[in-house]
A protein has these predicted regions:
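Short, solvent-exposed loop/edge segments of extracellular or virion-exposed proteins
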Residues: 60-71
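Conserved small/polar residues in nucleotide/adenosyl-binding loops
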Residues: 161-163
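Short glycine/proline/serine/threonine-rich loop/turn segments at secondary-structure transition edges
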Residues: 20-30, 141-151
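Aromatic sugar-binding surface patches on proteins
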Residues: 4-17, 127-138
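Short solvent-exposed strand-capping/beta-turn motif centered on an Asx-Ser/Thr pair
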Residues: 88-93, 105
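Extracellular recognition modules
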Residues: 15, 29-35, 99-101, 150-154
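Solvent-exposed serine/threonine-rich low-complexity stretches and specific carbohydrate-binding patches
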Residues: 1-8, 112-129
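Contiguous beta-strand segments within globular domains
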Residues: 70-84
Length: 164
């Protein structure tokens, strides 16, 4: 990127755009080189520089029936699905919100019970780079015999969605 300095000291924002899908769960470190008229004047290329490191979160999950601990549930009045969510590469000390939604696997649409989506969310403060969070979804599944469900999750930091 080219820029013209307006003072002896200053800063320039360098924007990196890329798909985060292939980088989920990785740490990315930015390196910069300052050149003038083809001559290199400064280089910042420290792979261990935490200030230049960006964590790309990754979410992996396992959903199970609360009563039997398996992936099979009964079409009963009060069913609870527990979604155990492992979140990797987040910043310790920051607050995150995990939001989940039960989906109908066949249609790809949100599962509706009495016309309402089945959702859950939990806000947590990260104690480290990796956390395990459980979301519970309790609903009337008595009319859902033969239905296969999946749980979708989104991780937010403030209003910004970090991971799908």
């Amino acid at each position: 990127m080219k820029f013209t300095a307006d003072a002896e000291d200053g800063t320039v924002d360098v924007i990196f755009e890329f798909s985060g899908v292939k980088t989920a769960g990785k740490k990315i470190v930015a390196f910069e080189t300052l050149e003038y008229k083809g001559k290199e004047y400064a280089v910042h290329a420290d792979i261990n520089d935490n200030d230049q490191t960006v964590l790309i979160p990754k979410v992996s999950t396992t959903a199970s029936d609360k009563n039997n601990g398996t992936h099979m549930s009964y079409a009963g009045k009060d069913v609870t699905i527990v979604d155990k969510v492992e979140v990797k590469n987040i910043v310790a000390g920051r607050e995150y919100t995990l939001k989940g939604k039960v989906m109908d696997k066949k249609t790809g649409n949100p599962l509706l019970v009495d016309g309402k989506e089945i959702t859950a969310e939990k806000t947590f403060k990260a104690n480290g780079e990796n956390e395990t969070v459980e979301l519970e979804f309790t609903f009337d599944a008595s009319a859902l015999k033969g239905t296969t469900t999946v749980v979708f999750e989104n991780l937010y930091e403030g209003d910004r969605k970090s991971v799908v």
